[in-house]
Amino acid sequence: MSLDLQYISQDPQHLPERPASTEGFFLENHGESIFGTVLIPGGAAVDVYPGIVLLHGFPGYTSTFDLAQNLRRAGLVVVSPYYRGCWGSGGRYTFSGAIDDAVRTASWMHEESTAKTYHVDRDKLFFIGHSMGGFISVNATRRLSWIKGTAVMSPYDLAGRAEAGDAALDQLIRESVPVMNVESAEALAADAKMCEKKVGPFRTPLKT
């Protein structure tokens, strides 16, 4: 199926054979449940669409559901996972864990049974990430050779932020900790420093 950008800001014609739908999903990752939504365009029973793993920013205050709806209108299947430790998913939130959750979600989307259920073209899978979700998207892409592309919006460069000092990240963590399940603000800051060393800043090429 081709994209139809005229429908980004308006609903397409109702298709009674298979109307557009929104479904919940959950996955197991390291013994904890990841929850999220799948938005599926309406169409014929045999239609398949490119798939998007849409990754939200640092948990607690913002959602990308409006963007997911616009992408679905244009003809994309949009999977939006909620990382462990936030928005109802089990476990504790860490930056490294969020990358792992993104990889787990994309791998699930790439499975034949999932693609069949949600009308996904397995050969056309992409990441889109906003803010911290951009950082997560880039680093999840590095681990999955079959991802076709990645788009980021206002990405937060967690690995490169050391050049600006720790104050901004410390403030970000302490503002968000009350609405997440974390071990502690200090543990999350330590995980961020581990990510700095392990994944590298955005200026590092995705592929060499």
Put a short name on every predicted segment.
Residues 54-57, 80:
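Structural cue for short, hydrophobic secondary-structure segments
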Residues 68, 72-88:
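Conserved alpha/beta-hydrolase
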Residues 2-47:
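N-terminal cap/lid segment of alpha/beta-hydrolase-fold proteins
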Residues 13, 24, 146-208:
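The alpha/beta-hydrolase serine catalytic core
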Residues 49, 56-60:
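Active-site glycine-rich loops that stabilize anionic/oxyanionic intermediates
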